[in-house]
C-alpha cells in the first residue's frame, strides 16, 4: 500500500511524531525504537510489550523494511560484502571489516556518486539517486542482526559492529537530509548507542555541509584529500574547483571546534607518479600546517578504466616518512577484501552503467596532471 511507512526512516524525533499521529503516548516511540534497533524485530507481533491495539495499527500502516540482500560475499581475510537492492535497477554495497578489537561497517549513502574522483571505480558509473534514511540505517540493521543470528548472539550480548564509517558509495554530505537522521540513530542509546568517536563521515570536501554537520551531529570527520595542490586536486577530485584547498582547510579548522576527536583524518590515495613523490609530501605539510590531523595513506586499488597504477611499497614508505618526521601520525591502510571487490575505491555496484560521458568532462580521455618536482606531466591513459 502506498501509505505504508517504513519505520527505519525515522530517527527518535520522527518516530515520536509518528506515534503521536497515531494517538499513542510518547513512551511507545522508545519501545518501538528498542525493538527495531536493539532486538532486530521486523514483525510487530514480536513486540510483546506493545499494546495489542498499537500492534494492530502498525500492522496495517507501517513496516520495517531494510534493503533486500542480492548477494553476500566473504573474503579470505574475513571481510564481508553485501550487495543490496535499493530499487529502480540500483544496488549498493555494504562492507564489514573485522579486526581484533573492533568490527567496522562501511555504509553507502548514494546509488552511484556524482563527485567523480579520478581514481575511484564507484564514480565511473555516475550518479542515480540519494538513498533514504531507511536505506542507510537499514544497511547497519541488516548487517548487525544477520551476523548476530549467525553468531548466536542475543539482544543483551555485545554488538558485532562497534564502528561505522560513511565511506561506501556516494558523498554523504550531498545527501545531508537523509544521512543526519541515520547518524542520530547510530548514536542514540535507544538504538545503536555508538559514541561520536566511533562514527566517521568521510567527505570529498563539501564545505557548507561540513559546517552544518559540525553543528548538527559532530561525529568524527575524514576528508578525502589525495593531492597537495589545487591544480592536481582539480583533476583528481573535481569538487576542488568549487571548494579549493584553502577553503577546505579553513572548514576543517572550524569543524575541530565541535568534533569528538582533536584531529581530522586526511585520506590520501597513493597513485604512482601522480601524487606520491617526496616533493608532494613536503608540499602537503604546508597545506595542512595549521590543521591538527593524521594521515591515512591508501594504496590504490587498480581497475581497468582508470589508467592509473598503485605506488610501490618503497615509495609509500618514503612518502609516509616525510609526514612522520614532521610529527604527523601516519598510517598505511592495509588492503582488505580486494578479492571480492570490497576494497576502498572498488565499490562499483552490479548495476546498470549510468555514466553520461558528455556530462562527466574528461573522464576516459588522456588527462595531463602536473607532477610537483618533476620535469614533465604524468599522462593518465584512456578509460
From Swiss-Prot:
EC number: 2.1.1.192
Disulfide feature: 106-344
Subcellular location: Cytoplasm
Gene Ontology cellular component terms for the protein in this record: cytoplasm
Biological process annotations from GO: rRNA base methylation; tRNA methylation
Domain of life of the organism encoding this protein: Bacteria
Segments forming domain Radical SAM core: 99-339
Keyword Transferase: yes
Cofactor(s) named in the record: [4Fe-4S] cluster
Alphabetically ordered keywords of this record: 4Fe-4S, Cytoplasm, Disulfide bond, Iron, Iron-sulfur, Metal-binding, Methyltransferase, rRNA processing, S-adenosyl-L-methionine, Transferase, tRNA processing
Record note on cofactor: Binds 1 [4Fe-4S] cluster. The cluster is coordinated with 3 cysteines and an exchangeable S-adenosyl-L-methionine.
The keyword Disulfide bond belongs to this UniProt entry's keyword annotation: yes
Binding site residues for S-adenosyl-L-methionine: 170-171, 202, 224-226, 301
Catalytic machinery residues: 93, 344
HAMAP family in the record: RNA_methyltr_RlmN
Annotated function: Specifically methylates position 2 of adenine 2503 in 23S rRNA and position 2 of adenine 37 in tRNAs. m2A2503 modification seems to play a crucial role in the proofreading step occurring at the peptidyl transferase center and thus would serve to optimize ribosomal fidelity.
Extra information: Reaction proceeds by a ping-pong mechanism involving intermediate methylation of a conserved cysteine residue.
PANTHER family from the UniProt entry: 23S RRNA METHYLTRANSFERASE, RADICAL SAM CORE DOMAIN-CONTAINING PROTEIN
Protein name: Dual-specificity RNA methyltransferase RlmN
Source species of the chain: Ralstonia pickettii (strain 12J)
